Amino acid sequence: MHNIRIGQAVDIHQLVEGRKLILGGVEIEHSKGPLGHSDADVLTHAIGESILGALALGDLGKHFPDTDPKYKGANSLVLLGHIYDMMDEMGYQIGNVDATILAERPKMAPHIVSMRTNISNVLHCDIEDVSIKATRGEKLGFVGNEEGIVSLSVCILEKKG
């Protein structure tokens, strides 16, 4: 394997009433949350899948299938911890992560530092190595109409040592 590897991913979930909105392990008060088998944390899913992609290990569904009852309601930060273990065993560490959340509401800015802290703690890297941004759908499409939420992630992994 190379000394530097790049991964990218996108995660999309439908927003529905009666579900918690959890992003980067932070529960955010909102009338809707993402529909999914686990806690449906689109941010953490995208980050985890970008790491899996950088390592050429496939996608989240390969490692944490939504057909497996043990992942029902799973905390996505725990799943990210398993992905970290895979990365560590392969001799890689985080160079940096850059992620974007696309959601019409609520405002993400008050929660970004907490998200970055949670992600950097699980990935055993400096908070400065984790960038999280948010943007709105400007009332366009399924994001703008508050029917769904999206997160994109790019990561660089570096060979340890």
Each model region followed by its residue ranges:
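Glycine-rich, mobile lid/loop segments that gate access to catalytic sites or pores
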Residues: 119
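C-terminal edge-of-domain segments
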Residues: 143-161
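RNase III-family endoribonuclease catalytic core
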Residues: 2-113, 123
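SAM-dependent methyltransferases
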Residues: 1-3, 160-161
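Pyridoxal 5′-phosphate
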Residues: 132-136
